[in-house]
């Protein structure tokens, strides 16, 4: 067990996870600017891209590259500097560190070494898109980028098709049409989806419709910019595999309680899942759980 007290005096340096704007420089926070000014080093996914940001805010702190191609080599170097007392900020090209970039491995290494990790709140494409999508904002399931190979992509989509939560994906412009075709095949043409592009920028755009409607738009439009895809969850899906029969020895009340404790669900959500697994009406499970009747 490791209990971190983020702002107590430390014998080592601190790793700061600093989010950067996803398109609009006005989304940079005062705290992020101050942190980047005060740390000893900035570990950047792309030093050239980050230098533009630093120049804009007149930040003079030195950088070191830290990306998927050199992360294993760099982690040891960064840990050594942190252990020697240096404070380091880690930034991605845009948005929140550790989300679809190698920052997670550095965080794990810091925790294993007893080094304090301090996250700063800020810009994030997934949540920005979700709250304006019009689809259910919770529960949601963030997946990120789908696999590149079609076979692997189809398999991933088949798994996602079982999920009742709203699903969040990232996608590049040159793959968008093919991904939408595969989504239509697996999820069904009538599944609701929202494409979000150029978030926070001048040409920010939301395309809302069914998969068939959105695919038709993509076939006849110029596809530019990075996309965030928000897909409606499967209302018939379940968070838990049907073949799991470990609940057979439990009462309905015990089953609901187990769901709440093990999967951090509210009673309403747990009752819904228990009803699916046991093939009962939700009203029956509700009554049994609350000892009604």
Q: Where do the PLM segments sit?
A:
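Glycine-rich, flexible N-terminal cofactor/catalytic loop recognition
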Residues: 1-66
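Glycine/small-residue-rich loop that forms an oxyanion/phosphate-binding "nest" at active or ligand-binding sites
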Residues: 78-124
